[in-house]
Amino acid sequence: VRHRKTALIWSLLFLAGLMAGFWMLNPAEPSYQGRSVSAWLDDIPMPKNSTAAHAALKAIGSNAAPSIIRRLRQSESPLQTKYRELFPRLPPQLAKLLPQPKAEFRYFDGAGAFLDIGPGVEPILIHSLKDRSLSVRVATASALGSLRFFDGADIRDAIPGLTEALHDESKMVRLHAALALGFTGPEAASSVPALIPLLNDSEIQPGNSGRIFVRAAAAGALGKIGPKAKAALPLLRSLLAEKDIYLRVVTAVAIWRIDADVTNTLPVLIDGLTQIDENSRWEVYEGMAEMGPRAKAAVPLLVSQLGLPPTPVNSYNSQKITNALQQIDPEAAAKAAMK
């Protein structure tokens, strides 16, 4: 036991020394309120400190991007991972002498940090889609899609890079690239040949560590591209026979948007109203709203879902349901509003 404890202590000291040297090699960084970008990035994963950290990155602007990329690369370091793993096992006296391990900086932390910079970060994100680091590639693809929330943002310049990212070895990169392309709509028609094969993606992570919904993301993107994605219809129609109701629903909406087919898609959407998670039903409501009077068979179920207990999700869904009813059957919408 003593031998193992001694080995653990020496291992920690060695790791701490390596990491100290690693951090000292970092180039000089911009600062804000006397703190470097890296110091602010340390606070991003910490709920109590993240608000101030995001405000600081917004103030620093594009000059913070190199540090964000560097931090994402460092997050993949086996040294950091091992140090975080071993530190809690140290004797308290020794732990006081060593630096606290840095909180894990995940891809969504990096994506949020990029978004603090705003639309001006787009050229950096496009370039970083080819970065050697998986964390950087996932974060940049995710951030590019989320730029749609910014006034004046236009990610059409990213379409070629995002299309190439559909071939990335990582399912997470493929997922976020497909989502981002969907937000560009018909402008992404050139990506259709690269999106179609993703409808057959295995979606299972290596080692069965979870499922990545690449097929649904690809189907959604093809639907948002619209009639220019007609080449995808044969494969999309085959997905309507899948067991996964969420995939069937997203596919049904996509087919409707590409081909205006109500006959084969509305029954799937009606099934989805009761079978998929409430957090995902908004996609069903949007599809039915687009169908208008042709979705009249769904009116009774839509009206019944207006009466669900009030929660943040149900309140959001109620707005979507009300809009769908107004598009499908204004008279039914008016009656439902009076209840």
List PLM regions with ranges.
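Short, Lys/Arg-rich N-terminal segment immediately upstream of the first membrane anchor
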Residues: 1-4
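Hydrophobic membrane-insertion alpha-helices, especially the h-region
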Residues: 8-23
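Structural detector for internal amphipathic alpha-helices that build alpha-solenoid repeat scaffolds
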Residues: 22-31, 42-60, 83-119, 127, ...
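Amphipathic alpha-helical scaffolding segments comprising HEAT/armadillo-like alpha-solenoid repeats
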Residues: 34-41, 62-73, 119-130, 152-167, ...
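Acidic helix-start/capping segments at beta-turn-to-alpha-helix junctions
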Residues: 70-74, 82-86
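Surface-exposed, flexible loop/turn segments at secondary-structure boundaries
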Residues: 76, 203, 278, 310
